[in-house]
């Protein structure tokens, strides 16, 4: 019995020593954060910290070998500035759904994932985070973010912030970018050669250059101010959504993997699909088109082109086509040669 008690005492003593041996700089910065005001009281009170010197015992904090490796403080009503600069063993931070106003993880060379979404951040410092792969900072008040030293970044969600311009140029490993619902007037994705998913709707973009993003699969530029948009030579592009842009001209060519095109609620007078042989769904409703030629689209199944000014519609030899909605047009020339699977044509309110 005495031997067992001795072993327990040794273990407890080791744990106490371990907690006390936390890196001094890390301990100082965490204590400073705990002293900052939260929604009610201090951050220490919000986290129900009984002893600010026992950092290793704080819920959501993981410590290994004298260094903090993870912080998970989601939805804890925390406030103020969180400074984690120089935490060399830190790999993951989740402080989403709080009221933080500023955050720094500068020099956290092991950091892989940051989630600081749904806060009140006006600034964030990611400098020197060379291992960073996933950044989620959506629904904040950021006006800028520097990604120059994040070469491993794969996922970035900065939607619903206050950016006027954003550059992910030369983020060679970036696969998914969500920057919807900001105030973007300029977006630079040049050189983001691994980019597959780009969601940049609900901004103020007047143009978008897609050079060097041949891996792109999904593109959403809904609700911007792009009047002319030419998409060419994107062999992996499967989905294009560009509604609500006041767009006058849309040209899509040499996109062999393209399946869906949604360009409704624009001012299109010109819409062309060239060398896009696998398109299955087109919605170009609520535009100003007078002619629409989509013949020889072998895999096209559904066409929505209502509320235009069409006088001619040609879907000849579209062998997979089953449904057309061409209501509210002026169609007098309707070509459906060899459309053997066409089952429904909604064509009311034409001459």
What residue ranges belong to the model's regions?
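Leucine-rich repeat
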Residues: 65, 87-90, 108-111, 129-132, ...
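Thr-biased low-complexity repeat/linker tracts and other Thr-enriched repetitive architectures
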Residues: 110, 122-123
């Amino acid at each position: 019995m005495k031997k067992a008690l001795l072993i327990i005492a040794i273990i407890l003593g080791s744990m106490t020593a371990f907690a006390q041996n936390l890196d001094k700089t890390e301990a100082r910065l965490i204590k400073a954060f705990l002293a900052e005001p939260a929604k009610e009281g201090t951050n220490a009170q919000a986290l129900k910290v009984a002893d600010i010197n026992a950092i290793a015992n704080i819920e959501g904090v993981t410590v290994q070998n004298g260094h903090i490796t993870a912080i998970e403080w989601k939805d804890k009503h925390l406030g103020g500035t969180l400074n984690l600069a120089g935490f060399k063993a830190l790999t993951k931070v989740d402080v989403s759904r709080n009221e933080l106003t500023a955050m720094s993880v500068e020099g956290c060379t092991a950091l892989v994932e940051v989630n600081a979404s749904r806060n009140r951040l006006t600034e964030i410092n990611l400098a020197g985070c060379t291992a960073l792969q996933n950044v989620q900072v959506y629904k904040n008040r950021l006006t800028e973010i520097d990604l120059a030293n994040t070469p491993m970044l794969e996922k970035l969600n900065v939607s619903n912030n206050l950016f006027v311009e954003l550059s992910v140029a030369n983020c060679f490993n970036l696969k998914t970018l969500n920057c919807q619902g900001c105030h973007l007037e300029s977006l630079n994705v040049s050189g983001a050669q691994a980019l597959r998913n780009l969601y940049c709707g609900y901004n103020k973009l007047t143009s978008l250059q897609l050079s060097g993003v041949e891996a792109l699969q999904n593109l959403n530029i809904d609700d911007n101010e792009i009047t002319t948009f030419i998409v060419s030579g994107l062999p992996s592009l499967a989905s294009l959504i560009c509604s609500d842009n006041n767009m006058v001209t849309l040209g899509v060519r040499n996109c062999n993997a393209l399946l869906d095109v949604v360009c409704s609620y624009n001012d299109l007078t010109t819409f062309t699909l060239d060398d896009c042989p696998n398109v299955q769904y087109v919605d170009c409703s609520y535009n100003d088109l007078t002619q629409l030629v989509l013949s020889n689209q072998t895999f096209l199944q559904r066409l929505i082109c209502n509320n235009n000014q069409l006088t001619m519609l040609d879907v000849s030899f579209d062998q997979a086509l089953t449904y057309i909605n061409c209501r509210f047009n002026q169609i007098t020339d309707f070509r459906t040669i060899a459309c053997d699977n066409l089952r429904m044509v909604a064509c009311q309110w034409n001459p």
